Amino acid sequence: GRSIGYRQLIVCPGIHLAWEKIEGLEETLGKNGVTSNYHSDLAPYTWHLTKNLKSGRALFTQPPIPIKCAGAPQKAMYLSSDYWLRHHMLEDIEVEFNTAGAVLFGVADFVPPLMEYVKRYHAKVVFNSNLVKVEGAKKIASFDIEDSEGNVTRIEKPFDMLHVVPPQVAPDFISKSPLADASGFFEVNPKTLQHPRYANIFSLGDVCSSPNAKTAAAARKQIVIVAENLLAAKEGRELCNSYDGYGACPLTVENGK
């Protein structure tokens, strides 16, 4: 690489998809019924699995937050289930959504309508269930499930189709640098998106530590704030533009809806 000097810097490298944090996943991804729409090349394989599964068990996973587009893990389940329902196969398929979180969705107002679709598709939701290992050849997925007292039990679940959402972390060159906060993400003032210790550095998008959902809609709003505040800092003016935490995550719950 090469070193480039700067007077001001905007940091927005995105988020790292940490496939390696799930034992055995990388070796079996894209075969043995294991897929992920977070890997764009595998979207056709997801569709292939959905179309060809006539019976059995379909597992869908969601890792601990933060992740990019927090609704995407559910979208895969809803759209697959809608296809099976429309083609009269759903009654022979056991659909299960394993989420490492304690709630179905982070915005409480949306949980009741989403639960209606969970019921419509006869899906089972398992909370505090984190995928930690995949044995592709055996078609077994292992989950660490935490109870209300914090005790963790590892459970093996057989599958015919497994849609995985990988854990997501800041890139190493951020998390291991002085620019990171305790979580490893790029530290910012959540209003100005300026680094609290390096006044000439700003950040936006999935890598920054602002508490909003990590979505393209959030980045679209953040870039305006960063541009205005960067110019203000350059000219010695007060940073008057403030990010309000806006984010959006469209949730597709059936074909065309």
Regions found by a protein language model. Name each.
Residues 227-257:
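C-terminal, flexible cofactor-proximal segment of oxidoreductases
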Residues 1-88, 149-152, 163:
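FAD-binding core/adjacent interface of flavoenzyme oxidoreductases
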Residues 18-21, 26-54, 158-222:
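FAD-site-proximal beta/loop scaffold in flavoenzymes
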Residues 1-4, 85-183, 238:
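A Rossmann-like FAD-binding core segment of flavoenzymes
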Residues 75-79, 218-225:
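Short amphipathic alpha-helical face segments that pack within enzyme cores
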